[in-house]
Curated annotation (Swiss-Prot):
Pfam families: MFS_1. It comes from Escherichia fergusonii (strain ATCC 35469 / DSM 13698 / CCUG 18766 / IAM 14443 / JCM 21226 / LMG 7866 / NBRC 102419 / NCTC 12128 / CDC 0568-73). NCBIfam families: PRK11195.1 (NF008397). It comes from the Bacteria. This is Lysophospholipid transporter LplT.
Length: 397
């Protein structure tokens, strides 16, 4: 496709529609593939501790490529970067379908996701401007939430029919995302001709990390969001083992329904935070963070499905109320110090590092034979204590 000189900045331009469709299909595939691959591990009798390791290889790719993916997105047409990234995801999903090692295939998907992330947000500013950019971000987030809900449930439901059906559906979703990327205009690269010296790129990224860590407000935000997303991913895997033990349900669909309750709650909590919390009153979100841990503790003791649904939605509401103001604080302060792109890249590194650490601890707990209910109780207690400590630190500084 030839390069476009004049960009149609309409919110519903052909290019914007292609971006939103590609994002939905790509995120749908990501979430469906997780639960489809977990079902494959169960069917092939992998040990239970290997389940969180699957996500660890995914986030490991994010961490490994964090210093470089931003420059990749800026050095080439972002639509083509998105196409390449979705192609990697398609290759990973297809390799799992055809019987290759699921951990290797899922690592390929993780590399694709790492490359995709900065390009998908960066292209919005190239396709729209002004107030339309805010609305475009809203459309992107709405399509992502819809994909998380539908993809998670589809992965579990289709896996109950047949694991290969679920895996094939994921590959088709990625193929659809690649096809949608074709319709994104080939815009000029934002910053072509940059140095590809790995050492210089790493040092530049390290400088951005240091700058944000030395600022009290951005450090507070980085720690808070990293704790939240690390805990959120760990909760996903906790549910997979908790459901058969606490509820006596052994299908693949029920954990995905429960995860969907958390996602719905996050949307509601995010809406409440937008109305009730400002950058000047960010500390209002901290009690919600502490309550997340308390509710996880009570949730772990449940043995009925309906209360479990209700408590997980409450966890989501508290989570949305907690994390949205912290995200806004980091973006605002980070934009003024290291730039919005660098701030997001550093945030991704922090969040994925927290995921890797928490999943590692969870996997170790399962490996040594600690029952899932005590793991849940300990997990909730430690999270509440960690957020309490963060709040005390923030008030003192």
């Amino acid at each position: 496709m030839s390069e476009s000189v004049h960009t149609n900045t309409s919110l519903w331009s052909k290019g914007m529609k292609a971006v939103i469709v590609a994002q939905f299909l790509s995120a749908f595939g990501d979430n469906a593939l997780l639960f489809a691959t977990l079902a494959l591990l169960k069917a092939q009798f992998y040990p239970e501790w290997s389940q969180p390791v699957l996500q660890m290889v995914f986030v490991g790719a994010y961490i490994l490529f964090a210093p470089f993916v931003g420059q990749v997105a800026d050095s080439f047409a972002k639509g083509r970067v998105m196409m390449f990234a979705n192609g990697l995801k398609l290759l990973g999903a297809a390799s799992i379908c055809f019987g290759f090692n699921p951990f290797v295939g899922y690592t390929l998907v993780g590399i694709g996701a790492a490359a995709y992330s900065p390009a998908k947000y960066g292209i919005l500013g190239e396709l729209t401007t002004g107030d339309k950019l805010v609305k475009a971000n809203g459309l992107m987030e709405a399509s992502t939430i819809a994909a998380i809900l539908l993809g998670s449930v589809a992965g579990g439901v289709l896996a109950d029919l047949h694991v290969l059906v679920a895996l094939a559906a994921c590959a088709l979703a990625y193929a659809g995302a690649v096809a949608a990327n074709i319709y994104i205009p080939k815009l000029a690269a934002a910053r072509p001709g940059q140095s590809w010296n790995v050492l210089k790129m790493t040092c530049s990224f390290k400088s951005a990390c240091t700058s944000l860590w030395q600022n009290g407000e951005t450090r507070f935000s980085l720690v808070g969001t990293s704790l939240f997303w690390g805990a959120g991913v760990t909760l996903r895997f906790l549910l997979v083992l908790w459901v058969p033990v606490a509820l006596g349900i052994t299908d693949n669909a029920t954990p995905t329904y429960l995860n969907a309750m958390v996602a719905i709650g996050i949307v509601l909590g995010a809406g409440a935070a937008a109305k009730l919390v400002t950058l000047e009153t960010v500390s209002r979100c901290m009690p919600a963070g502490i309550l997340i841990g308390v509710v996880v503790l009570f949730f772990s003791l449940q043995h009925e499905l309906l209360p479990a649904y209700a408590l997980l939605m409450l966890i989501g509401v508290l989570g949305g109320f907690f994390v949205v103001p912290l995200n806004a604080l980091l973006q605002e302060r980070g934009k003024k110090s290291v730039g919005a792109g660098n701030a997001i890249a550093v945030q991704n590194l922090g969040e994925n590092s927290a995921m890797l650490l928490m999943l590692g601890i969870y996997s170790l707990a399962v490996l040594v034979g600690i029952p899932v209910v005590p793991i849940g109780i300990g997990f909730g207690t430690l999270f509440a204590l960690a957020i309490t400590a963060l709040w005390i630190w923030q008030r003192r500084h």
